[in-house]
Regions:
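ATP-binding N-lobe of GHMP and related small-molecule kinases
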Residues: 1-92, 110, 160
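Residue-level recognition of strand-loop junctions within catalytic nucleotide-signaling folds
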Residues: 18, 245-248
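Conserved, helical-rich catalytic subdomain that frames metal- and/or nucleotide-binding sites
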Residues: 51, 133, 138-232, 247-250, ...
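Phosphate-handling active-site elements
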Residues: 78-83, 106-124, 248-261
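DPxDG-like acidic metal-binding loop motif
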Residues: 92-119, 130
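Conserved glycine-rich beta-strand-loop-beta hairpin in the small C-terminal domain of fold type I
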Residues: 240-242
Length: 276
């Protein structure tokens, strides 16, 4: 039996850094959505666990226990032969490694005909629990507190200037680690336009330090700002991937083509959010 599991990209529509624990973990308040761009994990029962990596971003991806996919496979309780089709750029702020680990846990559950192994997800990384659900949520704490959120559909263009950003270094550059959270009670958004208007009043607290450390992030944001029909733009996670929101997928597709043509070295994709 072979199973294929999609590992969708995680987009931080907002990311407020609200504190830091004594153990060094940062406290976050973030609206998270998942989109129809991502990696794919293929799993087959085997006598010994092994990982191979294919796809446009396969080069340099480790296949040993330093890869979250192999660590997730270790929680399965049985060996698997795994293939990771790496379509998302690495270290890019859209949860690629965490999404891959979560997809591996889901693949193991399907192969073993057992519930998804949720208990060990947080031990793999702060973003793995949210990626395991792959649904719109408000994520707080260090990533373990997940509250489902009803969000209107969003259409966007994702841009990564093909530079990797160190999450620890971005956090080190953050001027304040005790910033305001989102409102305790989130508003109702009757449509995408009202949602985008509200999102524009929120923040990604990691954007400014990322721009300071990595000028290419500023270049990506500037290019998105000039895209016809762009309604709001922001960096996702700790970067370097940035996104702009559009009225519909058609407009996003057109903008993505234009941006890719103007910046052939960049990773540019149009995307739509997945339903809850």
């Amino acid at each position: 039996m072979t199973v294929k599991v999609f590992a969708p990209a995680k987009i931080n529509l907002t990311l407020h850094v609200t504190g830091q624990r004594e153990d060094g973990y940062h406290l976050l308040d973030s609206l998270v959505a998942f989109v129809d761009q991502g990696d794919q994990v293929t799993a087959t029962p085997a006598t010994v666990s092994a990982l191979s990596v294919t796809g446009p971003f396969a080069q340099g991806v480790p296949t040993d226990s330093s890869n979250l996919v192999m660590l997730a496979a270790g929680l399965a309780g049985f060996p698997m032969s795994l293939t990771l089709d790496k379509r998302l750029p690495p270290a890019s702020g859209i949860g690629g490694g965490s999404a891959d680990a979560a997809a591996t846990l889901r693949a193991a559950a399907r192969l073993g005909a057992k519930p998804v192994i949720a208990e060990g997800a947080l031990s793999l990384g702060a973003d793995v629990p949210v990626c395991l659900g792959a649904k719109p949520v408000r994520m707080s704490g260090i990533g373990e507190a997940l509250t489902p959120v009803s969000m209107p559909a969003l259409h966007m263009v994702l841009v990564n200037p093909r530079v990797e950003v160190s999450t620890p270094e971005v956090f080190k550059s953050l001027e304040s680690k005790t910033n305001a959270a989102m409102p305790e009670v989130l508003p109702d958004w009757p449509d995408s336009l009202s949602f985008i208007d509200w999102l524009s009043t929120q923040r990604n607290d990691l954007e400014a330090p990322a721009v300071k450390r990595v000028p290419e992030v500023a270049a990506a944001l500037a290019a998105l700002a000039l895209a016809p029909g762009a309604q709001m733009l922001r960096m996702s996670g700790s970067g370097a991937t940035c996104f702009a929101l559009f009225e519909n997928r058609y407009t996003a597709d057109a903008a993505a083509l234009q941006l890719a043509d103007s910046n052939p070295w960049w990773w540019v994709k149009s995307a739509s959010t997945l339903p809850g």
